[in-house]
Amino acid sequence: MSTNLNPFMNNTPSSSPLKGSESKRVSKRPISSSSSASLLSSPSRRSRPSTVYGDRYIPSRTDIDFNSIVSISSMASVPALNPSSTEDQVEYQKERQAHETYNTLLKNELFGEMLSKDTVGSESSIDRIKNTRPSTRGNVHAENTTRHGYELERVSTPPPEAAGLEEFSPHSTPVTPRRLFTSQQDEITRPSSNSVRGASLLTYQQRKGRRLSAASLLQSQFFDSMSPVRPDSKQLLLSPGKQFRQIAKVPYRVLDAPSLADDFYYSLIDWSSTDVLAVALGKSIFLTDNNTGDVVHLCDTENEYTSLSWIGAGSHLAVGQANGLVEIYDVMKRKCIRTLSGHIDRVACLSWNNHVLTSGSRDHRILHRDVRMPDPFFETIESHTQEVCGLKWNVADNKLASGGNDNVVHVYEGTSKSPILTFDEHKAAVKAMAWSPHKRGVLATGGGTADRRLKIWNVNTSIKMSDIDSGSQICNMVWSKNTNELVTSHGYSKYNLTLWDCNSMDPIAILKGHSFRVLHLTLSNDGTTVVSGAGDETLRYWKLFDKPKAKVQPNSLIFDAFNQIR
């Protein structure tokens, strides 16, 4: 008895024994070719009558719903700025103005016709839309009262009978709606004859004129009186918007600075009043004359330079070293004229007040030196418990601010030993400090990585005026001479510069380009350019401010005549 190993080949059982006898009685009838074809042919679906559909039915509004205006005005807006995460305030304001213009234009095109019917006095529909305030979401659809004289009705699609239209029958002929506005381009490509159905669709006139320029198309489609844009919308688009300040986000000059130290406590660049930039690169100091572009090698040392600072007149340069010595160079002679001792560790900060040079060191001490005296220093201050990493003189008010690695800021009156004020709110080292050239007694301080906060103090009233989270380590700062704005340089983890509006404390611009901490910062004598230096061994020149406008001098003849009056 043979068995089949393939279960799928003979899986169907044989005839049932109960039906076996009946199957023998079934007689075979002859099958015609037509019937066999019908049996073997594939089943087909029953044909259905074809339906011809017309063009889309465009709904229209029966009544203007003022709630729709409110709903549009309550759409999601640009999120509020956070100074720690925003890119810059100017770009935000530009984007906000574009959003507001678009929203106003959209609402005026949708609802302007109805609004213009109920204008009071000289108020236009644009003014009414701008003065519309969004309602709360839960009350927009619940109110049934009238607002501004309009009945609050929902926007609805009218039935065909109300719109004066007939319903489309399944056998109606499709009709393309006629355009409401024609353009010059339509006249050029219009068919040559009023042909009836069945005529050639490709029978067109030849183009009579040359191809229209983009300006001509814009003139014909938008500025033309036949334009579908409402006149007040045109006026809105053509009206000049708010002019924003243009700030260059790219440095206009980049210089290689090999061996520029990447040390948070160093201060290695400074700009003189004679427009000469001094840079300490490793064990050498170079001078760059920005008027001529000449670069001069000033000096070398066996130690490492850690700080430098120009005297107010720009004739002498003070240089601090890692061994604690301070040298003073005559720039014209390119010669060291004096070496001052007193510190036993590196000198990380220097600041001048006329003929008084103040130095701060890692030995926790501040020394006042009168360069006219033979003694290397005449006063010692030991207010800080750790390294002194920031010093700034306010020459106009004769006040000194010092910041230390102990997170403390001290303010001194002149060369006194004891501070008159102490600020201890920072949570990291305070190196970055700047006095306001516009308001007396206003001091800005910035904290390190663990703090990241920019604080502005009024030392005359002992009041903290501002406290902003900058988002990253503040390494240095300069206050603009020409505007009430502040530039801060940052380290971990943004490596950028931030321009702040000191009135609102909003970031105006973020300047990117450095790939390491921006530790060194200085301002040009005319107050227009900021130079930044970083551990990526580059110096970048940023044009941020305009020159101050010259003051109009009174008529000399009238002034002289006035002075002659006794």
Curated annotation (Swiss-Prot):
- WD repeats sit at 258-298, 300-339, 342-379, 383-422, 425-467, 469-510, 513-552
One biological process term from GO is:
deactivation of mitotic spindle assembly checkpoint
Q: What post-translational modification does the entry describe?
A: Phosphorylated at multiple sites by CDC28, probably in its CLB5 bound form, in S, G2 and M phase of the cell cycle, thereby blocking the association of CDH1 to the APC/C and promoting nuclear export of CDH1 by MSN5. Dephosphorylated and activated by CDC14 in late anaphase, which may be necessary for PSE1-dependent nuclear localization.
**Gene Ontology cellular component?**
anaphase-promoting complex; cytoplasm; nucleus
**What happens after mutating residue 239 to A?**
Abolishes phosphorylation
Keywords, sorted A to Z: Cell cycle, Cell division, Cytoplasm, Mitosis, Nucleus, Phosphoprotein, Repeat, WD repeat
Q: Pfam families given for it?
A: WD40_CDC20-Fz
Q: Does Cell cycle count among this protein's keywords?
A: yes
Domain of life (superkingdom): Eukaryota
Location comes to: Cytoplasm; Nucleus
Note the InterPro entries from the entry.
Answer: Cdc20/Fizzy, WD40/YVTN_repeat-like_dom_sf, WD40_CDC20-Fz, WD40_repeat_CS, WD40_repeat_dom_sf, WD40_rpt
Task: Name a GO molecular-function annotation.
Answer: anaphase-promoting complex binding
Chain residue ranges for the region called Disordered: 1-56
Stretches of Low complexity bias are at 29-44
Motif C-box location, chain numbering: 55-61
The observed outcome of changing residue 16 to A is: Abolishes phosphorylation
What are the Polar residues biased-composition ranges? 1-18
Look up keyword Zinc and say if it applies.
no
**Where Phosphoserine occurs, residue numbers?**
213
Domain comment from the record reads as follows: The C-box is required for the association with the APC/C complex.
Description of how the protein assembles with itself and partners = Associates with the APC/C complex. Interacts with CLB2, CLB3, CDC5, HSL1, MSN5 and PSE1.
| Task performed by this protein | Activator protein that regulates the ubiquitin ligase activity and substrate specificity of the anaphase promoting complex/cyclosome (APC/C). During telophase and in the subsequent G1 phase of the cell cycle, recognizes and binds proteins containing a destruction box (D-box) and an additional degradation signal termed the KEN box including ASE1, CDC20, the B-type cyclins CLB2 and CLB3, the polo-like kinase CDC5 and HSL1, and recruits them in a C-box-dependent manner to the APC/C for ubiquitination and subsequent proteolysis.
Name the protein family.
Belongs to the WD repeat CDC20/Fizzy family.
Instruction: From the Swiss-Prot or TrEMBL record, give the protein name.
Output: APC/C activator protein CDH1
The organism is: Saccharomyces cerevisiae (strain ATCC 204508 / S288c)
